[in-house]
Every structure is written in C-alpha cells, then in structure tokens.
From Swiss-Prot:
Keywords, alphabetical: Cytoplasm, Nucleus, Repeat, Ribonucleoprotein
Function: Required for normal vault structure. Vaults are multi-subunit structures that may act as scaffolds for proteins involved in signal transduction. Vaults may also play a role in nucleo-cytoplasmic transport.
Top-level taxonomic group: Eukaryota
Biological source species: Ictalurus punctatus (Channel catfish)
Domain IQ positions: 688-717
Protein's name according to its UniProt entry: Major vault protein
Entry's Gene Ontology cellular component terms: cytoplasm; nucleus; ribonucleoprotein complex
Amino acid sequence: MSKRPAGSHMEHNDLTDASIIRIPPHHYIHVLDQNTNIARVEVGPLTYIRQDNERVLFSPTRMTMVPPRHYCVILNPVARDDEGHVQFDTAGQAKLRHADLEIRLTQDPFPLYPGEEIQKEVTPLQIVYPDTALRLQALLDFEEESGEKRVAGDEWLFEGPGTYIPRKEVAVLEIIKATVIREHQAIRLRARKEGVDRSGTRRVTGEEWQVSKVGAYLPGAHEEVIDIVNAFILTDKRALHVRALRPFRDAGGRDRRTGEEWLVTVADREAHIPSVAEEVVGVVDVTTLNSREYCVILDPVGPDGKPQLGQKRVVKGERSFFLRPGEHLENGIQDVYVLSEEEGLVLRAVEAFNDTEAQEEDEEEEEEEEQAKKTSVQRRPGDRWMLRGPIEYVPPVTVEVMLRRQAIPLDENEGIYVRDIKTGKVRAVIGHTYMLTHDEELWEKELPPNVEKLLSTVRDPLADRSEHNQNAVAEPRDKTMVVSYRVPHNAAVQVYDYREKKARVVFGPDLVMLGPDEQFTVLSLSGEKPKRANVIKAICLLLGPDFCTDIITIETADHARLQLQLAYNWHFEVKNHSDPAQAAALFSVPDFVGDACKAIASRIRGAVASVQFDDFHKNSIRIICSAVFGFDEKLAVRSSLRFNQNGLVISSVDIQSVEPVDQRTRDALQKSVQLAIEITTNSQEATARHEAERLEQEARGKLERQKITDQAEAERARKELLELEALSAAVESTGAAKAEAQSRAEAARIQGEAAVQEAKLKVEALRIEAEAEMVRLAKAREQELLYKKELDHLEVEKQQKLVTIESQRFKQLVEAIGSETLTAMARAGPELQVKMLQALGLKSTLITDGSSPINLFTTANGLLGAMKAPE
C-alpha cells in the first residue's frame, strides 16, 4: 500500500463507507474491486459513486507535490512507456518495477499508484557551494549523460558551485570542503588510491606529497588531507634543524640521504616549509658572542659538512653563528680571561703544540714587576706554565686552564705558607704581596689541638688570665696563613724548630710568626685552690709581678691541724733578655706555679711543726715569713725567695685566712673567742649603764626646775588674760549702740543716693530713646520722600515715552496710509449718507421741538439710523 498521512485516514475514516465520495482537485483515492481484487486510482475533481462490489481503501488524499528545487524517492515505481504513460497488465492493474527506485523532480502533482511507496519525503536538492564538492560512489554500473561509464565502486567528485541532481545509481559519501592555504602554509596529502593528482602527477597508494600554492585547494576523490604544515619563519636569530627521512632532493637542489641532518638558515630562505621527506628536529637559536666571550665547539662540522668527531674548535667574539647538527658547546659560553697585573692563569698542555704566546719569567721571583717576551715554545702534553697579566687570553683547544691565580696581599705582619709541588719544600712568604707560580701551592700548617684552641680563643692572656675555666669564643683559623701570636708586655713565648732542633724565646711586646717547622711551647700550669696540676694552658709566660693563692694544711707541735690560705707575690727576674741561656731558663720548669707552691708549703709545714698553737696564733706572720724567706748572715728575715732554676722570685706572703681543721679545736677556739668577746662586752655594758644613770639624774633635776618656772609663767599669763577680758566687755557694751546708729544712718544715706542716681539714669534713658526715635522717623521720612520722588520721576519718563511712541505711531500710520487715502476716508461717510438720502427722495425735512438744539452735522446719521459706536 502507498504511504498516506495517518491523521487524515483516521479523520475521514467514515468517508470510505459512503456511497458518494467527493474528491477535491489534486486529491485521489484507491478503489478496490472486490470481484477481481484489483485496485485502481481515481483522481479529482470528481464525485465518485461507489459500487456495491467496490471498497474505497482510504479517504481522499492530497497528491504528492514536488516544488521547484526539490525531489522525492519512490519505491516500487510504476512502469511507463516511451511517452511516459503508465502501463497496465491485462487485468487492468498498473505494472510496478518492484525493488526499484525512482527519483522524481519538479512536476505536476501526481498520485501514488497501488504498490508505490515514498521512500524519501520531498527534500530540497543539495546545493554545492564554491570550494566544496560531493564525494560520490557508484552503486551500479551505468553511463552518464556525457557518455562516461561508471563502474560500481567508482568514486568521483561533484564540484560546486551547482545543484546536485541525485541518481538512484549514485550514493553521496561525504561533503568535502576546500582547504585554504595561506601564505607560508602547505597541506600534506596522501593518496588513497593510485591515480593522478590535480597537477597531473601520477600517485601511488599511500604516497604523500605537499601542496603549497596559496589559495583554496579541493582534495581529489582519492586524496585525503593529513595535516596543514606551517612554515618556520627563519631570522638572523633562528635556524631550523632538519633530518632527512628518505633520500630526496631538497628545495636548494641538494641531494639528501636518509638520516642526514642539516641546518636551514635565513641565508637559504626566509620561510621553510618542511617537505614530506623531512623531519624537524628542533629550532636552533643563534649563539652570540660579544668581545669578552668565547666558546669551545665539540665535534665541529668540517668544510665537507661532516662532523669531525673528537675534535674541538675555539670561537671568539664578536660573532654570531648557529650550532650545526652534531655540534655542542663545552661548558657553554665562557668569559674571556681578562687578567690584571695581580692575576695569572695556570695552564696545562693537553697535547703537543707550538706556543707563541708563552711568557718566560725572570729567575728572580721576588721582583714585583716581571718582564715577559713573546717567544715560540714547544709544549708537550702535561706541561704546566703560568700566564701573567695584564692580558686578555682565550685558551686554545690544546690548553687546559687549571687555576686562576690572584696575588695575595700581605701586610708586614702577615704571611702565607707556600709549598713547591716539585721539591716538596715549604717556605713562609711574609710582608709583601705574592702570587703563587705554576709549581707552587698553598700549604696548610697543622697545629696540636690544644694550640689551635688557644690561638682561636679571643682572650687577652694578661687581662683574662683568671678566666681560664670559662668557655671563650673560638674563631676558625686559615691554615694557609702564617701562624702569628702577639706576645703581650712583660711576657715571653718559646718557639721550637723541629727541623733545626733549637728553640728561641721572644719577649713582649712583640709578634711571633711561626715558620713551617716551628711549634709553640705550651705551658701547663697548676691552678685553682688548692693547687691542681694541668689546670691552666698557656702559650705565653707572664713575667709578673703577679700573685697566686694556695690553701695548705699544717700541724703544730701540740697536734693542732690548721688550714691556711696564702697569697704569694711573684715575678721572674731576667737580667739580660738577649742572653739565650737566661731566656731558655724561664721555660726549664714546665709548672713553675705548682713547684713553687709545693716548695713554700713544705717550708711552712716544717716551721710550724715545732711551734705550739698559741705561739703560732700570736706570731703566725713572723713564723711563716721566716720559714718562707729564711734568714741572712745577720739573722734577719730575707725580703724574697729566689728559685735559681728559672729565676722565679717570691717577694711577699699574705695570710688570708687561718682555720682549724679539727672540729673540736675549731669549737674550742670559737668558744674562747666568744668568751673573750663576752667579757669585753659585759665590761662595756656596765660602764655604759653607770653613765646612763648619772645622766638620768641630771635630766630629772632640770625637769623639776623647769616645771616650777612654767607654773609661775602660767599664773602671770592668766592674770593678764582676765584684765583683757574685762576691758573687752566694757568696750563691747559701749560700741554696740554706737555702731548700730551709725549703720542705720549710713544705710539711709546710701538708699537716698541710690534713688537719686536711679532717677537720673531713667531720665537719661528716656532722653536717649526719644532722640533715637526722632532720628529713626527722620530717616524714614527722608527715605519715603526719596521713594516717592523716584516713582514720580519714573512715571513722568513713562508718560513721555508713551506720548513719543504714540506720536511716532500716529505719524508712521499717517505716512503709511497717505494724505489722499485719509481724505478719501474722511469724505466717504458723508458722501454715502448724501447718496442714501437722495435715494430715499427726501428734499429737506426737519422735525424738532423748541428745547432740543439742532445739530446739522449729525442729521444724516439720524435719518439713516446709524448707530454710534460705543466708546
């Protein structure tokens, strides 16, 4: 059955059973003959009378209308003859081309015969715009109107602009749009099938090529666009690194092999579009060197364009270049070595070459200015030499820069340790600026840990000598600098040379600078109270005078054990500092403090052991001094004690405290001391008490006498007070009345004066008010007169101007109308009245009374009944 609108069938379902069916124009119905079972088409306009053996299959349906530029597809179309008429079989049924399609374009409305179906509704024809195309494929073998034969499976393009008329043998695969190729662009194409491209070149399946012509490119039926390739814009600062994917000839006409790499620069072309046989490895930026830069290129490309593997080339600025494929920089761009007079370079030859920039130094290395001359020197691999400034140096590929040396400035009291790497000899350079040669290096001098600690501690050996137990701030030491030590005043330092095996003593104030093989003699002295060994570590020996304190324990003849705290004043006695023997004797006793304290303690113990406690308690200083210093030939106590080994002299002894060691002795001594203090205190207390009692008696007598004197004075004062009170009462009674009368009179006088003053003030106020009112009225009248005067003046000016304006208006009016016109206007009225009276035929008529005057001027107006215009 043919396709019909479902809604129409349901809406007119009742019409199929009617006997009379009215078919409008451009409508049709299918009528089924139930006897022959054959359906036919009835087309309107028609009033169809249905027979009993017929059945209308559907209500009237609108014919199919194909507007212009539209088409539809009919399935199972009817067969037509050469003239386009429908063919019927012997039974009267329309013949159908089953399973066939028919595309119908714009035509008159047509009905669908039984068996026909609309496979595709009315659809607009496809418009192919410019730069677009339809890729078509043949479904059946056919021959086009132009005579070209198509085989099933063939593909071709229908290019615009145009309207595509569909065929049943052709299927539209896709719409192809042209690719716009802009400036510096290309499109990469691939052949989907063997054929000829638009330029006429034969292409095989899978072959790729590029089209770079500016404009729109429409790919062929067997071409596909892989990518749009943008050109690389080449400048003076950018180049392109390209690799060949297969053998080909590049745009410059050179044959390239597979894997070959090269650079495309702006010298070749300004914009480069990589071809299908090229691969872009990367963009290479320009390498720019200024006048103070250089670089070393590894594996440089030779004149033949091939990398020279293992070789180097030095390039110095000013220059700009591109690194070619395979080349790379060693350590990047480097600065040219610009050496001043105080700088130098240690160089080493990596291969044999003839050096034309060598410098030969004079043999005297102490001179500050070293002369040099350019010669040709044959260098062998491994040779080391030094290049001194001032110079600007770029090392060649045969030279390696080992070190950059700079002159080390040294003061008179500064130095460095220098070691010759060839001989191993170490020496100290002191007091002048020095630059190491190519065979020298700085040597680090190692010191014992205790010496390092003493040197790195920022501590004054004289002022901070008692702070040996505190943690001092340590500063790191430069081991290549000459070790120096400032010897303070009245001190000595011993330095021992292990290579020469001799020592030297330096007295302060002076500066000690150690040689490479010299070391300080470290003093290890006893300290604290009582003395302990190895407490104080020191480099310098203080010569004094100074003191040391020690605590010793002694025992008397009666076995009383006492603890003494003694302070000794000491100093070293050196008569000649230049005498090496005397100077060396100072350091002959490593711990002179401990030895001296032990010797003195031994003497004191021996002397006290033969003395009773009471005698020692009373004569302790004499006993200790005699024990320490001894007696001379005259049996007098010596003034000092001298140790001949190192020249130490003990000049005095101070007993700071004496305490018993035994507790019972300490308690008994304390008790006796307390008893003596108590007796003395009681005696002083009794004396003070007697003196206080005497003073108290004297004070008490003075107090009684003072009391009697005060009572007499009080009675005398009371008498005077009573007399004054009586006199005051009399004066008070008399003065009260007098004062009251005086006050009343004074009040009346003041009141009268106030009334008079008030009256005067009121009169003055009224006078002032009256004068002010008169002044105000005068001002007001004056202003009012001025106002009236101005108004009158303005009114006069107004009337004058109005009269002038009116006269001007009348004058201009008269001038505008004219004298003749005015004469005519004046005569027009009377002449009209005369003519009207003449028309009435009146000769002369006068009717009046005696009391009414006659006005001949208005007679005509009265006769004619003219109305006087209201004013």
